[in-house]
Amino acid sequence: MRASALQIPSIRIERGITDSIQSIIREVGFRQVVIVRGTPRDKVLTICRAIEECTEITSIIEVHHEPSLPVLETHLNALKTQNIDGMIAIGGGSVLDMAKALSGLIPAQKSITTYLEVVGLGQPLDNNPIPWIAVPTTAGTGSEVTKNAVIDIPDAQRKVSLRDPRLLPHVALIDPSLTDETPKHVTLACGLDAITQCIEPYLSKKRTPLTDALVEHVIPKGLKALTNLMTTETQSDRDTMALVSVTGGIALANSGLGVVHGFAGPLGSVTGAAHGEICAALLAHGLKAHRAYVTDPELVVRIRAIEGWLADALGGEPTDAFDTLDHWIKNQGISGVASLGLTKAQIPEVAIASQSSSSMKANPVDLDTDILIRILEEAL
């Protein structure tokens, strides 16, 4: 048996759990907090008002794009002089990543690049992060349970991670009601990101029995729930996708990812496309590459299981499942990576950059530059 361990925060998952935000804040002991939030929708504003009634809010930061180094530096300059004992993040993956990065870097003593992977030294944080509470409003990235924050570095055209086990939130509050009535295109992109983050750890060279037990349960359920949500809004399917998202976050944090996420960082930095849409456009092509190059008998069985789950959710024959998935995603409105802004001339650059990605290190097979280029060309 492979060695197994899980690093996870305290997780509370329940429809309506955010109605208890005040008691949770008192339990944690926050007195002066920064709120990091996305677009202030009614549900988000309701939570913010509840927070304001029980603690002092020193700043509110609104996040509308994936965190970038220049924006992060601006917020750090403003916050380092404030007396803060907690942070609360309410939003999607970009919001949670911004809060996570700020929680770690506000107490840090050195330059930001000291702690960044790939473009920096990748050193551990020299001080404990500010405790924070994660309240995701989308079911996608799983950032509420991961120990890294993804930061865009425009000058390097790379997205890299700030990574430290202490970046996990003090508690993650998973309230599926916050995702109700999410627009279809957001549901699709976030949902396929979440499913990818369950599938890639299932095939990862770092997979463990613990993460296997988690993702095997939710991949088939997630595929059916996401398919349903493209035509019908139901609370039960929203609840399922919230579970898929948090499960994918736990799995990737403990077993790694693979080729789809290996591409996602460089491709996103080059094109500016949303992370979930990139994962959606690449998932079927990444799976085809695994089927073509994986020889490990155990992984071959797992790939066949994925084909079966896809056929159950989407119809068709298991042997055609990856093509069926690709066609279904396109029919739902996410076309190839060319539609996201990638040109054929940029493909070699993205392929080469992806090879140094932390996500690619867990891919079940080593893929050389020529193969990576071919995958991207087929995904155009």
Where are these regions (language model features)?
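Short, amphipathic C-terminal "tail helix"
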Residues: 344-380
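ATP/NTP phosphate-donor binding region
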Residues: 1-86
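Carboxylate- and glycine-rich phosphate/diphosphate-binding segment that chelates Mg2+/Mn2+
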Residues: 148-255
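Glycine/threonine-rich beta-strand-loop-alpha-helix active-site module
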Residues: 70-177
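Gly/Pro-rich interdomain helix-loop hinge
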Residues: 270-346
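Glycine-rich phosphate/pyrophosphate-binding beta-alpha loops
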Residues: 140, 246-279, 357-361
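Flexible, glycine/charged-enriched surface loops at secondary-structure junctions
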Residues: 205-214, 229-240, 255-260, 297, ...
